[in-house]
């Protein structure tokens, strides 16, 4: 994350500015089956993955509605980009239950990105 994290408004502005680029790259992204590394890196540098991350690790702690507007705007360019950013954003949710030292260790490397899934672990 960054020392001065972009706000949700900053990310929304950048997402809007990048819609056409994302649309133009969508077919190549789909064919590759993954985000191009330069795109993943720039999304990280622009603060997208840290929208819900705690501020003590450089996250924006954005309200859910603001983050979802960012995701919606990215999806207007390329839904797969929006999906990847959404996974990165939601993967930061459990960080609030970790100690400050653990969070700092996870984000010791600039541009750290998380990915994961939530699934029910109980039985009915």
For each feature predicted by the language model, list its residue ranges.
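Alpha-helical interface subdomain recognition
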Residues: 2-69
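Glycine-rich flavin
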Residues: 37, 41-44, 51-124
